[in-house]
């Protein structure tokens, strides 16, 4: 068996990726979230596949087909809520994974980092089109508001929006194509994840100390397979608690009402994992400016490798940048809170301050703190 896994063309790839992979001996539990994201993707694809067997992408029957899944299909309620809450778990793991990458300087591995940003954007797109499918009030109005943002693009905006809608409003054509996108995108995410791993294994993982670990590597199996299994069991425990005890806690009550184009909800807001970007969008009074800020709020992650001037790897020995990093995390939480609040004083003002702070920390404060720390090292 040992000879087979090292020589067989297919098993050799698996062996080099998950068994004999040389891994730093000191990586902490923060490195577990990559495998947890893989687990979340598997859960989402499997539950989504079973949901797709019973779902109908037609405006007249979409809402009732979701109700039918929950009421009449064997364990349909469980599959539906595993899928809905699985998306939340996916984004929790994703945010922690990106946060760990920023803290420990993983953005230095630029190819892996940039593929990760593409994965992040693709996952957000998948979640957005998926949120439209139950065809509740918030699904419909969320789709209308977010797709309508493209009309801010000069010259081609209106045509582009009508092209995406497949008509002059969000209707049957929109729902059908969103279902098609939602079905295919997870498989594209899986393909990108393999490319992400490919680039990671070219350079090897970094580690919490930020020091070169070439002289201190251990095989991935059994040490980290056991560690990842513990993480997977804990993830499943949290997901099952969420699904079985609090299935609707992260959903929107408006989505229990079928979509009605003639009745606008009091506060249109996306799912919780988009609220930080939604708050940035709303904080700019100009429509085109808001859309650009929304896109930049994610794409600015690509600036980390370019703005990095530090002579050290990661933040473990950099107290000044550590403080700025935790202010950045707190600021993100404030943006998430503001995104779910109505557009009125004082929330608009807090949102504008938090949005400016978000970009200022990445573009100004972190590079300045890097320079300060480099000068301290010279002393």
UniProtKB/Swiss-Prot annotation:
Molecular-function annotations in GO: metal ion binding; ubiquinol-cytochrome-c reductase activity
Keyword Kinase: no
Biological role: Component of the ubiquinol-cytochrome c reductase complex (complex III or cytochrome b-c1 complex) that is part of the mitochondrial respiratory chain. The b-c1 complex mediates electron transfer from ubiquinol to cytochrome c. Contributes to the generation of a proton gradient across the mitochondrial membrane that is then used for ATP synthesis.
InterPro entries: Cyt_b/b6_C, Cyt_b/b6_C_sf, Cyt_b/b6_N, Cytb/b6-like_sf, Cytochrome_b, Cytochrome_b_C_euk/bac, Cytochrome_b_N_euk/bac, Di-haem_cyt_TM
Gene3D superfamilies according to UniProt: Cytochrome Bc1 Complex, Chain C (1.20.810.10)
UniProt binding sites for heme b b566: 97, 196
Keyword Nucleotide-binding applies: no
Quaternary structure, from the entry: The cytochrome bc1 complex contains 11 subunits: 3 respiratory subunits (MT-CYB, CYC1 and UQCRFS1), 2 core proteins (UQCRC1 and UQCRC2) and 6 low-molecular weight proteins (UQCRH/QCR6, UQCRB/QCR7, UQCRQ/QCR8, UQCR10/QCR9, UQCR11/QCR10 and a cleavage product of UQCRFS1). This cytochrome bc1 complex then forms a dimer.
Gene transcribed to yield this protein: MT-CYB
Other facts noted in the record for this chain: Heme 1 (or BL or b562) is low-potential and absorbs at about 562 nm, and heme 2 (or BH or b566) is high-potential and absorbs at about 566 nm.
Sites where the protein binds a ubiquinone: 201
Family from the record: Belongs to the cytochrome b family.
CC cofactor: heme b
A biological-process GO annotation: mitochondrial electron transport, ubiquinol to cytochrome c
SUPFAM superfamilies from the UniProt entry: a domain/subunit of cytochrome bc1 complex (Ubiquinol-cytochrome c reductase), Transmembrane di-heme cytochromes
Transmembrane intervals: 33-53, 77-98, 113-133, 178-198, 226-246, 288-308, 320-340, 347-367
Protein's cellular compartments: Mitochondrion inner membrane
Sorted UniProt keywords: Electron transport, Heme, Iron, Membrane, Metal-binding, Mitochondrion, Mitochondrion inner membrane, Respiratory chain, Transmembrane, Transmembrane helix, Transport, Ubiquinone
One Pfam family here: Cytochrome_B
Cofactor note: Binds 2 heme b groups non-covalently.
Membrane topology value: Multi-pass membrane protein
Amino acids binding heme b b562: 83, 182
Gene Ontology cellular-component annotations: mitochondrial inner membrane; respiratory chain complex III
Main location: mitochondrion
The protein, known as: Cytochrome b
